[in-house]
Amino acid sequence: MMSRRTVLMAAALLVGGVTACSDLTGANGRADGVYYLQTVNNNGLPFSYVDNSTGHTLTVLSDQYVLNTDGTYSDQQSYTDNGAQSSYTESGNWSQSGTLVTFTPFFSSTNNTTAYQATISNSGYSGTKTMSVNFSGTVWYYST
C-alpha cells in the first residue's frame, strides 16, 4: 500500500505538470506575450512598399505587439516615410477564440480604429508563439 506522502507527491506532480504545459502547447494556447515582426509576405526586414493613399515609399524597420493578460495590447512600429524616420502606435483590447485573435483599437496614431484579426499558433517543443496578420493581402508574420 502506498503511503499518504507518496500519493500526495504523485498528485502534486501530476497537477503541476498539467498546469505547466497547459498554455504553451497546442494550437489553442493563450495568445498573450510579446511578438516581434519577422517577415512581410515572406520578405525579411526592412520591408518597403508604396502607400497607395499617399504615393510615399514606406520602409518598415521593426514592429512589436504586446498582448497583455488583462486583454489590452499595444503596437509600436518604426518605419521611414520617403526616407524620413517615423513611428506608428496603436493600443486597444484583444480577445481570443481558439487560434483567432481580434484586435479592437481605441487609439491609433493614424486614427484608424477598425477592428482586425490575426491567427495564432504555438510550438509544443520550443514554446514559441507565432502570429500572422493579413492587412489587405499583405501577410505580416510575428513570433515571440
Predicted features and spans:
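Bacterial N-terminal signal peptides that target proteins for export
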Residues: 1-8
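Sec-dependent N-terminal signal peptides
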Residues: 8-15
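C-terminal motif of bacterial Sec signal peptides marking the signal peptidase cleavage site
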Residues: 17-20
